[in-house]
């Protein structure tokens, strides 16, 4: 609220990221494409925004592009990884979204994603 009169170029990267996410949330579309929506946020705000988005996007089809394996493991119902060898489907943790960062199945999935990302042909 304190920034509502500011022009976009006067906002920080994280503030602009939050405005973009808020605009997307307000549109109410059944299909949503999010390209690195949490990338410019600090860890605390990132976790809060992930939780907010997960709740507000429940029941919608969401394609989330991320370079963060932990984020994919925490938020993904279906996970694909693209690396030098192609496109790979990964089984996500079986617990419901939004998963705790430190849950064993989330950590195992994150490890699997990191190993796959590090593969070289």
Predicted feature locations:
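Conserved signature/switch motifs of ABC ATPase nucleotide-binding domains
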Residues: 6, 27-28
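Helix N-cap at the start of a conserved alpha-helix in ABC-type nucleotide-binding domains
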Residues: 43-45
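Hydrophobic anchor residue at the start of the ABC signature
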Residues: 21
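Conserved catalytic segment of ABC-fold P-loop ATPases
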Residues: 74-81
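Catalytic Walker B motif of ABC-type/P-loop ATPase nucleotide-binding domains
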Residues: 32-36
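Conserved beta-strand-loop-alpha-helix hinge in the C-terminal portion
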Residues: 84-114
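Conserved ABC ATPase signature
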Residues: 7-11, 15
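Conserved catalytic loops of ABC-family nucleotide-binding domains
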Residues: 48-64
């Amino acid at each position: 609220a304190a920034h509502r009169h500011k022009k976009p170029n006067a906002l920080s990267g994280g503030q602009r990221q939050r405005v973009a996410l808020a605009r997307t949330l307000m549109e109410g579309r059944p299909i949503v494409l999010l390209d690195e929506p949490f990338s410019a946020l600090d860890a605390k705000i990132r976790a809060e925004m992930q939780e907010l988005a997960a709740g507000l996007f429940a029941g919608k089809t969401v394609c989330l592009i991320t370079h963060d394996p932990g984020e994919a493991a925490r938020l993904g119902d279906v996970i694909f990884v693209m690396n030098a060898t192609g496109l790979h489907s990964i089984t996500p943790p079986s617990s419901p979204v939004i998963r705790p960062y430190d849950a064993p199945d989330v950590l195992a999935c994150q490890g699997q994603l990191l190993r796959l990302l590090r593969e070289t042909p």
